[in-house]
């Protein structure tokens, strides 16, 4: 208990970064479980595993989106890796406001708890992660779950703002005089630009959510048409934050990938200044294209042309980054490690998401594909595969700085292959389904879409087996650590017996051996049961398809 209090109340940037990482990975696992239930429901026609409870299906979608965006991807990059490594890379002993750093972590933890509490309160919150009125108004969702979730958005937003203020104060107030801005690494530049974006956009979202709370609890009519309000106002407010949120998530990943390319290539990324300017241009343009999410609300032609054109224009600085990474790979004598495979997979996945985004920037195509699974496949390739694969890349790259273990190239290649195959099995068919107008946010569909929905479930279960493989991999590491520990204790006990004529160390070794061996056996039994569960799901689904079709 003392150790737990010492860790949680620490003001060290490294300890706070590790706490962010642990809680964010836990929240990501919770969000993944929600998505697994969504895919299991969509693998059947009609009454699936949720027994026709469409409200609970919408609650799962809402919780999955909010947790993955606000409680996993944002904190794991800005709170975890940025908190841990930015002071080290910039040569600072700590963040400029250590207690503010600790306060932001606790607010993040409270916000995550409020999101989970909103999932468990009454009938839940089934309004979608975009929180659109009028569905979120008191007439349609009267439970306290909506208030819990909007309070969670406030807490998570304040946590991110405090973290960003702390980062900006650290970079500008603690900078040494002989350090120029161009001497910073690309990861520091990416964190700086992301912090500025957060400070600009998050207060706008907080204001919009506060107006919803006023409509629900204080009888105002900011979004109520009957009282003179405007429904489209909240869409403008939300997407003014929502689209820069994509770059808030991706820019730290861009900086992380650039830093890893520099490390494995033993030289700077090609055209470092162009990489910095491209990130700045992406951030600036990203704040002026929010309405390309709203082409179907009845805009005039000029507004559609402007937002569509600027959306295409964002592809130019993005292409600069992609081509610079590829050029750095081709013209650098780098050693082939598992990090190289991860970076290549990130570039490939992000390229698919960027190309499908160019399709959606066209106004006519976007109107046809709006609210279909094409959009779901696009933003999952950008966020779920681009950002998460980038996080995996940075996490494994920096793992040697946290744990004294060595990862084998063969096992990492298996890990990358499984992740690549499972992710593409899950998300790539969504584009084809979207072309055939497969609707999102609806748990039932015609029988003609059954094959591809079940095929995507196999990709989801392959990712589940990947998580179990990671658990088994760490159990293998622990097993070898146990073996080395027991061998050393056994040698020490023999030394004590021959020189001091006592069997006490041998009894201690035997006791530790039995206790830890029991723990190892229980761990592996649990893993075997999990693998059997995954196999049972595969067998049950295949049997159902065989008799149904």
Curated annotation (Swiss-Prot):
It comes from Leishmania tarentolae (Sauroleishmania tarentolae). Its EC number is 7.1.1.9. There is a cross-link at residues 243-247 (1'-histidyl-3'-tyrosine (His-Tyr)). This is Cytochrome c oxidase subunit 1. One of its GO terms (biological process) is electron transport coupled proton transport. Its main location: mitochondrion. It comes from the Eukaryota. Fe(II)-heme a binds at residues 64, 380. GO terms for molecular function: cytochrome-c oxidase activity; heme binding; metal ion binding. Cu cation binds at residues 243, 292-293.
């Amino acid at each position: 208990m003392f150790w737990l209090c010492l860790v949680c109340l620490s003001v060290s940037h490294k300890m706070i970064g590790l706490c962010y990482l642990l809680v964010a990975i836990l929240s990501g696992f919770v969000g993944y479980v929600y998505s697994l239930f969504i895919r299991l429901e969509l693998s059947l026609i009609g009454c699936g595993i949720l027994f026709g409870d469409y409200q609970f299906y919408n609650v799962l979608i809402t919780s999955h989106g909010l947790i993955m965006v606000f409680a996993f991807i944002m904190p794991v990059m800005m709170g975890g890796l940025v908190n841990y490594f930015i002071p080290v890379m910039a040569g600072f002993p700590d963040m400029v406001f250590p207690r503010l750093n600790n306060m932001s972590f606790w607010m993040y933890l409270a916000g995550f708890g409020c999101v989970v509490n909103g999932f468990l309160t009454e009938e839940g919150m089934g309004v979608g992660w975009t929180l659109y009125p009028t569905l979120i108004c008191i007439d349609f969702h009267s439970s306290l779950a909506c208030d819990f979730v909007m309070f969670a958005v406030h807490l998570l937003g304040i946590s991110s703002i405090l973290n960003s203020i702390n980062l900006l104060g650290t970079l500008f107030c603690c900078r040494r005089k002989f350090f120029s801005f161009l001497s910073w690494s690309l990861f520091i530049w990416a964190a700086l630009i992301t912090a500025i974006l957060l400070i600009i956009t998050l207060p706008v979202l907080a204001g919009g959510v506060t107006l919803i709370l006023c409509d629900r609890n204080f009888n105002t009519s900011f979004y109520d048409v009957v009282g003179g309000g405007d429904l489209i106002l909240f869409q403008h407010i939300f997407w003014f934050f929502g689209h820069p949120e994509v770059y808030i998530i991706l820019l730290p990943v861009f900086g992380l990938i650039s830093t890893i390319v520099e490390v494995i290539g033993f030289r700077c990324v090609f055209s470092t200044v162009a990489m910095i300017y491209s990130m700045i241009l992406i951030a600036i343009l990203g704040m002026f294209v929010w309405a390309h999410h709203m082409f179907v609300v009845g805009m005039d032609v000029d507004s559609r042309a402007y937002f569509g054109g600027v959306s295409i224009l964002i592809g130019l600085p993005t292409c600069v980054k992609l081509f610079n990474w590829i050029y750095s790979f081709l013209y650098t004598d780098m050693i082939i490690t598992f990090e190289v495979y991860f970076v290549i997979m990130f570039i490939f996945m992000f390229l698919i998401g960027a190309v499908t985004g160019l399709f959606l920037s066209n106004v006519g195509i976007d109107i046809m594909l709006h609210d279909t699974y094409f959009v779901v496949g696009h933003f999952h390739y950008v966020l779920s595969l681009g950002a998460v694969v980038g996080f995996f890349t940075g996490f494994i790259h920096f793992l040697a700085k946290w744990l004294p273990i060595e990862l084998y190239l063969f096992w990492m290649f298996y890990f990358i292959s499984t992740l690549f195959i499972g992710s593409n099995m899950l998300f790539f068919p969504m584009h084809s389904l979207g072309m055939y107008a497969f609707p999102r946010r609806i748990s039932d569909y015609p029988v003609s879409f059954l094959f591809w929905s079940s095929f995507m479930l196999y990709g989801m279960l392959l990712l589940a087996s990947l998580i179990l493989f990671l658990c088994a991999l760490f159990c293998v590491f622990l097993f070898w650590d146990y073996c080395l520990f027991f061998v050393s204790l056994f040698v020490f006990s023999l030394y004590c017996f021959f020189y001091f004529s006592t069997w006490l160390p041998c009894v201690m070794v035997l006791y530790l051996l039995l206790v830890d061996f029991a723990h190892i056996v229980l761990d592996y039994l649990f893993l075997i049961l999990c693998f059997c569960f995954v196999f049972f799901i595969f067998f049950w689904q295949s049997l159902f398809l065989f008799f149904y079709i």
